[in-house]
Curated annotation (Swiss-Prot):
Keywords: Aromatic hydrocarbons catabolism, Cytoplasm, Detoxification, Hydrolase
Gene field: mhqD
Subcellular location: Cytoplasm
Organism: Bacillus subtilis (strain 168)
Its EC number(s): 3.1.-.-
GO molecular function: hydrolase activity
Family of this protein: Belongs to the AB hydrolase superfamily. AB hydrolase 2 family.
InterPro entries the UniProt entry points to: AB_hydrolase_fold, Dienelactn_hydro
Catalytic-site annotation from UniProt: S100 (charge relay system), D150 (charge relay system), H181 (charge relay system)
Stated name of the protein: Putative hydrolase MhqD
Main location: cytoplasm
Catalytic EC class: hydrolase
Amino acid sequence: MKHIYEKGTSDNVLLLLHGTGGNEHDLLSLGRFIDPDAHLLGVRGSVLENGMPRFFKRLSEGVFDEKDLVVRTRELKDFIDEAAETHQFNRGRVIAVGYSNGANIAASLLFHYKDVLKGAILHHPMVPIRGIELPDMAGLPVFIGAGKYDPLCTKEESEELYRYLRDSGASASVYWQDGGHQLTQHEAEQAREWYKEAIV
């Protein structure tokens, strides 16, 4: 997968996953804001929708192509495994930071694979897939940033994702913003403060 890697000085690795139309550079500044010392691994989605990179196909707005989602989730997991060898970082210290479509593929990693991530910061995610048995996520720290008036990820959707994670044992937290789907500076600050407490 097309990506950029910036070496840090700590053991943590931030896996940066952009929203629709973004690229591997989009969340570098956010990653450095959250953890100035972490290694940064920015990844570009390999699916194109009207020329815009995404991490998996969708059938329509808010309706995911679940078969493609499963395939792309496995591809991303395999890529992380390979990148850990290529760049010589600690595979057990990977924390996802995703926005929108990137948050959805990060959530899908959690839904499909046990111990695939050390933690996750999900900005405006949806429930990636329903009707599957989720792995044990005992104690896994997960931050969900949600907008009370988000037209793409409704309040009900955010709460449903939180319940799935919580019921699978994750230590999940939802941080609500008064706005919509945009990622605000205040939300980024909340994510950073959460990270300082939750990721050790």
